[in-house]
Amino acid sequence: MNGPWTEWDHVLKVDPDKPLVDGETFEDVCQTGTDAIEIGGTLDITTEKMQEVVDACSRYDMPLYQEPSNPAVVVESDALDGYLVPTVFNAESAFWVAGAHKEWVRIDGPLDWERTATEAYIVLNPDASVAEVTEANTDQTAEDVAAFATVAERLFGQEIIYIEYSGTFGDTKKVAAAAAALTESTLFYGGGIGGYDSAYEMGAHADTIVVGDLLHDEGVDAVSETVAGVKDAHADGEI
């Protein structure tokens, strides 16, 4: 499992539906020290909004990926390094496990498979928009999370396992359980990373932390603190 994400400590997720902090630019965003930018969101996303962010970020030397929330908002652009497509392993609705993906292939025909990978989401915050939209069963123990991670890696060959707590800082025991269950896949974590300390704490368990709302709420300096936190955790041998 040798995708570029195996080398990432930090991913910055840009929501096309949310503005940057006043006075900040996408050049500033690309200078935060993050390893890659992922463009995506759950609500009110359109192709036009996606394209605007792709165009703005593509001017800078930064790995750039789209995370499409549904097939209708996929942007076909050579400026993108690729597509990271969520599949929600604990979704109650089959549409978010494979149905949306089937529709994408049916509508658009052969995809750019060389640039397309999936993220095996395990959604654990019941109050998050993604949990509501996908009807995720978020009532999972640490053992459940470890089992989902194992199934995603071993049975389905997923290269990225993504523990999603969007909107709140997650249970480190559950993230640690997922990490212990994996042997090759890269473990992403997203949710509630608000500064150096939280990035360091979760960096002790996850291979890669994903920061999103912080960019839009507090700005690029706050994001840079999270970059430092996770990189220090990994340098200190926490993972």
UniProtKB/Swiss-Prot annotation:
Reaction catalysis annotation: sn-glycerol 1-phosphate + (2E,6E,10E)-geranylgeranyl diphosphate = sn-3-O-(geranylgeranyl)glycerol 1-phosphate + diphosphate
Cellular compartment(s): Cytoplasm
Give the matching CDD domains. Answer: PcrB_like (cd02812)
Spell out the disulfide connections: none
Pfam families recorded for this chain?
PcrB (PF01884)
Keyword Metal-binding belongs to the record: yes
Q: Which cofactor does it need?
A: Mg(2+)
Q: What is this protein called?
A: Geranylgeranylglyceryl phosphate synthase
